[in-house]
Amino acid sequence: MHNLQVRRHYAALKGFYLFAFLGTGSIIPLLSMYLTKEQHLSGSQVGLIMSLGPIVMIFFQPFWGMLSDYTQKTKGLLAVCTSITGIIGLAYIAFDSFPLFILIAACFAAFQSTIIPLSDSISLRYTQETNGNYGGIRLFGSLGFGVAVFAMGQVTNQLYPIHVIFIFGCAFLCIAAILASQVPGQQKTTKVNIRKGFRELISNKTFLIFMIITFTTFAPNLANNTYFSLFLDKSGASLSAIGILFFIGVISEIPFMRFAQTFIDKMGLLNVIMLSGGVSLFRWALYFTAPSLWIIYATVFLQGVAIGLFIPAALQYVKKITPRHVEATALTMYAAIGNGFGNWFCTFAGGYIFDYVSIFAVYLLFGILSIAGFGLTLYLMKAEKNKHTLHQPAVTFKP
């Protein structure tokens, strides 16, 4: 493959992740504040709107994956859905009705749910074909999200009204859509029968077990984004400190994503997944004990270890254990379990625990889930050593 073309494709992929996450990072973290401050919605109304995203993703992410596998037009689908996501975001400015906000939130989540799994599918396939580093591309997403959260907080606090987050978000997502049209395409393969492909995945015991690992290990890290500010506030952190710690946590993912492939090459996929799960478990156990603020400051980088290593390793593992012709479906099912159902469950259950017990008890729930994920990862590691004890379909692509 021509070196110049490869460099252009890598630049397009990095640019897409950067601007796509700049877009979503501009809107999602401050959406609840916009609905509360400018639209004067109640807490329960805001909670309902914010909970729609994960629920919608549960259903739509597998749909987009199956559509991608069937049409084999992944990058076109990605470009269209990314631009539509940004345009839908503008509707929050145009309307001021709670029922319409519910509709807008559902539509926004439906199209936004394509961004991560389809771009990951393209990036994983291309880095494998060119012996590249997926983590070196994906880190631009963490960079974009971290910069967006920090910058939008400053912009809306000092310069402009909060509704500008939708204008910036739309602009960034439209730029990402243009870049999506420049990413590498995929080679044509035999079109998959959607029902047959889905049955193939749900009959894959290894895949199903790993979906549970994703639910128990990765989902608490996502739900932590909802409760971390409450945890910090209860621990005595100021508002400015909370913003800085959020930023440091997101940015800390970058170096670990950058060197994740080095860890994977030396340790193996499941060992890296177990390492990230162990770090998550340690973090939740620490937070459950209501530590001093200086300990929280000193350990915030653990988010980078837990998420920065898990994402590249988990995606490559899903790709490894599933046939190529249902790859996009598998990745979107993985996203639906982690970003969708798992995130929703941990956030929903955590809300009840926070209301009736304490914010620190929320991290006990996260810790219990992480213990289960750690144990299942050990099970898969043993099963890999004794492959005859665990049935899995033949993989139809070269690793």
UniProtKB/Swiss-Prot annotation:
The keyword NADP does not apply. The chain crosses the membrane at residues 9-35, 43-71, 76-101, 106-123, 135-157, 161-180, 211-230, 235-259, 270-289, 293-315, 328-355, 359-379. It is a multi-pass membrane protein. Pfam families: MFS_1_like. It is found in: Cell membrane. GO terms for cellular component: plasma membrane. Its main location: membrane. Residues 1-8, 72-75, 124-134, 181-210, 260-269, 316-327, 380-399 are cytoplasmic. One of its GO terms (molecular function) is symporter activity. Keywords: Cell membrane, Membrane, Symport, Transmembrane, Transmembrane helix, Transport. Residues 36-42, 102-105, 158-160, 231-234, 290-292, 356-358 are extracellular. Belongs to the major facilitator superfamily. This is Uncharacterized transporter YwbF. It comes from Bacillus subtilis (strain 168). The gene is ywbF.
